[in-house]
């Protein structure tokens, strides 16, 4: 019979690897030096450290003249938050080549160029909020007058789009529609447009794809526009956008997929990369779990099984709120 002590104090093999270690505050003076320890801290800090390494590798390749086409996907709540300005900066600086987002990721960017969203609280009486006409996104408040103001701009924009479609004899794709929104912002809005993702995508000719363009306030405004005018001519084409998006992946020498959140943007990007044998680099930032079989929670390794991420790709998934980790990730890679 094995002695209890021998069971508890079982001999082990020695292993090689990175020692777990955190910053000793007497030895660090700036935040950047603290972040340098992340890959050695363990848990999700290590995943963030790995994401920094992957994105830096992509940036180094691009700086040396190698082609790595960067796809960025994000859900609407990312734009609801202060991450909007980080993404706009990335587009402005030429760090992103292709964007996929939801309808909210488009319209909230435009709305914020009109009036800001307001920091609120998670714990409020939501029935009272409704009575006051204040919408809540977590602890971010959006007074309904933002959407009233948005409609004032969208109706003349729709009229412009309708005339464009009549002149060219075919509908705009969703990415063309968003490009024209950027042009419209450039013409109609003031300095605040310079914090806008759509504006800089227009200026830098970065396509923004939105396969579910009507699933939000833009869809609401289209409904009002069509019902009030009896219009059945204004159409947004999503079918031809899938060709454009897929070909942007197919024609790239290498691709990197950076995805904040899950849902449609995540799948649109990795599915486009399926047609080229998978993306070469992938960084996921998510709070979704894989246990329910959802696409949002599917880890990169599951994407490998579908051919959407290459088996030898550099990839990592960070399980965290993107508002916590994305600013650190961008700062460390870009600065």
UniProtKB/Swiss-Prot annotation:
Pfam families listed in its UniProt record: DS
Biological pathway: Protein modification; eIF5A hypusination
Domain of life: Archaea
InterPro entries: Deoxyhypus_synthase_arc, Deoxyhypusine_synthase, Deoxyhypusine_synthase_sf, DHS-like_NAD/FAD-binding_dom
Chemical reaction(s) catalysed: [eIF5A protein]-L-lysine + spermidine = [eIF5A protein]-deoxyhypusine + propane-1,3-diamine
PANTHER family noted in UniProt: DEOXYHYPUSINE SYNTHASE
Family: Belongs to the deoxyhypusine synthase family.
Protein's name in the database: Probable deoxyhypusine synthase
The organism of origin for this protein: Thermococcus onnurineus (strain NA1)
UniProt lineage: Archaea, Methanobacteriati, Methanobacteriota, Thermococci, Thermococcales
């Amino acid at each position: 019979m094995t002695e209890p002590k021998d069971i508890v104090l079982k001999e082990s093999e020695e292993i090689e690897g990175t020692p777990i270690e955190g910053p000793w505050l007497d030895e660090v003076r700036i935040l950047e030096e603290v972040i340098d320890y992340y890959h050695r801290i363990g848990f999700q800090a290590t995943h963030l450290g790995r994401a920094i390494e992957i994105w830096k590798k992509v940036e180094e390749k691009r700086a040396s003249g190698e082609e790595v086409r960067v796809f960025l996907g994000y859900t609407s709540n990312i734009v609801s938050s202060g991450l909007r300005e980080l993404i706009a900066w990335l587009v402005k600086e030429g760090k992103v080549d292709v964007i996929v987002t939801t309808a909210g990721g488009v319209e909230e960017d435009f709305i914020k160029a009109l009036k800001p969203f307001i920091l609120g609280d998670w714990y409020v009486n939501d029935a009272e909020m409704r009575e006051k006409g204040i919408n809540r996104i977590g602890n971010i408040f959006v007074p309904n007058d933002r959407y009233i103001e948005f409609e004032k701009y969208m109706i003349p924009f729709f009229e412009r789009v309708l005339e464009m479609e009549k002149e060219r004899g075919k509908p705009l794709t969703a990415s063309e529609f968003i490009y024209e929104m950027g042009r419209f912002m450039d013409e109609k809005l003031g300095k605040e447009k310079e914090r806008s993702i759509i504006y800089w995508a227009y200026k830098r000719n970065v396509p923004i794809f939105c396969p579910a363009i009507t699933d939000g306030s833009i869809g609401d405004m289209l409904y009002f526009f069509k019902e009030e005018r009896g219009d059945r001519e204004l159409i947004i084409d999503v079918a031809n956008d899938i060709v454009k998006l897929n070909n942007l992946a197919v024609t790239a020498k290498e691709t990197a997929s950076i995805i904040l959140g899950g849902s449609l943007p995540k799948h649109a990007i990795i599915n486009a990369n399926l047609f080229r044998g998978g993306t070469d680099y992938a960084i996921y930032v998510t709070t979704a779990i894989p246990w329910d079989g959802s696409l949002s929670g599917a880890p990169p390794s599951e994407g490998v099984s579908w051919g959407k991420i290459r088996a030898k790709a550099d990839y990592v998934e960070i399980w965290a709120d993107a508002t916590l980790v994305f600013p650190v990730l961008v700062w460390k890679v870009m600065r």
